[in-house]
Amino acid sequence: MDGKAPAAFVEPGEFNEVMKRLDKIDEKIEFVNSEVAQKIGKKVGRDIGILYGGFIGLLLFLIYTVVSSMFM
């Protein structure tokens, strides 16, 4: 070899068929990746919601204890 890549000649029909199959595979991969990203997003959203809920609950509890101790 003299450092050149080997060349292959393919009929245009075969080439188009292979490209269509590769496009279908690419669409499936993109779909799976988007589903995985959506699932991760839901988990992160749930965790953030739990943290916000805990923080607001703690804040309400502190306000309640301060207000109730003022009137005793």
From Swiss-Prot:
Localisation per UniProt entry: Cell membrane
Membrane topology category: Single-pass membrane protein
Catalysed reactions listed for this entry: 5-methyl-5,6,7,8-tetrahydromethanopterin + coenzyme M + 2 Na(+)(in) = 5,6,7,8-tetrahydromethanopterin + methyl-coenzyme M + 2 Na(+)(out)
GO biological process, one term: methylation
Broad enzyme group: translocase
Keyword list, A-Z: Cell membrane, Membrane, Methanogenesis, Methyltransferase, One-carbon metabolism, Transferase, Translocase, Transmembrane, Transmembrane helix
Pfam families tied to this protein: MtrG
Molecular function terms, GO-annotated: tetrahydromethanopterin S-methyltransferase activity
InterPro entries cross-referenced by the UniProt entry: THM_MeTrfase_su_G
Domain of life: Archaea
Gene Ontology cellular-component terms listed: plasma membrane
Residues passing through the membrane, by range: 48-68
Catalytic activity, EC: 7.2.1.4
Pathway membership, UniProt: One-carbon metabolism; methanogenesis from CO(2); methyl-coenzyme M from 5,10-methylene-5,6,7,8-tetrahydromethanopterin: step 2/2
Function: Part of a complex that catalyzes the formation of methyl-coenzyme M and tetrahydromethanopterin from coenzyme M and methyl-tetrahydromethanopterin. This is an energy-conserving, sodium-ion translocating step.
Complex and partners: The complex is composed of 8 subunits; MtrA, MtrB, MtrC, MtrD, MtrE, MtrF, MtrG and MtrH.
Similarity section: Belongs to the MtrG family.
Annotated protein name in UniProt: Tetrahydromethanopterin S-methyltransferase subunit G
Gene name as annotated: mtrG
